[in-house]
Amino acid sequence: MSEDTYKTIAVPSEGIYTEKRSKFIAIALPVRTVEEVKAHLETYQKKYYDARHVCYAYMLGHERKDFRANDNGEPSGTAGKPILGQINSNELTDILIIVVRYFGGIKLGTSGLIVAYKAAAAEAIAAATVIEKTVDETVTFLFEYRFMNDVMRVVKEEEPEIQEQSYDM
C-alpha cells in the first residue's frame, strides 16, 4: 500500500463471538465523517437497547489520525482499545466497528473481555470486503490557450479523472 492509497471496507459486515454464554455482535461500517459515526451509534444503540454494553472504535481519514475508542461502561481499556487494535492490525480507515454485548451471566474478567471484544471485531473484519482506495484531490487548472498542448500532454501521461472541462475564449 502506497502513500496515495488506503484500505477500508466496501459495505457493512457482521461478526458474532460467544464466550461463556455472553454474546458479542460486531458490526463493521464504512464511514467518512464523525457525523456519520454519531448517526450509526445512535441507530445501533436504539436497535440494541436491551444490550448490556454497546462499545465501539473508529478510524477516519487516509492519514489515520482521527480515531476514538469507547468502552461504554466496561472496565477501562477492555473493549474500545481491542476493537481499535483490530482496525490498526488490518491497517483500515474510514471504518466504525460497534460491538454489542449481551451478558450471559458469567463474568469474563479483564483478560476475557479483551479477548472477546478483539475476537468479535476480528470476525466482523473477516466477513468484510476490504478494498484499497486512492486518495483523491480536486485540482483546478486555469491557463492560456497557448499552453494547451503542454497541459494536454501531462493529462495524457498522468491519466487523471477529469470531472469537468470548460473553455472560455
Residue ranges: model-predicted function:
Residues 1-77:
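C-terminal regulatory domains involved in ligand/effector binding and gene-expression control
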Residues 37-40, 117, 150-154:
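Hydrophobic side chains in well-ordered alpha-helices
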Residues 48-51, 158-163:
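A common structural junction motif
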Residues 130-147:
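Short glycine-/aliphatic-rich beta-strand segments at the starts of folded cytosolic domains
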Residues 142-161:
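Short amphipathic alpha-helix segments
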Residues 164-169:
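Non-DNA-binding regulatory cores of transcription-related proteins
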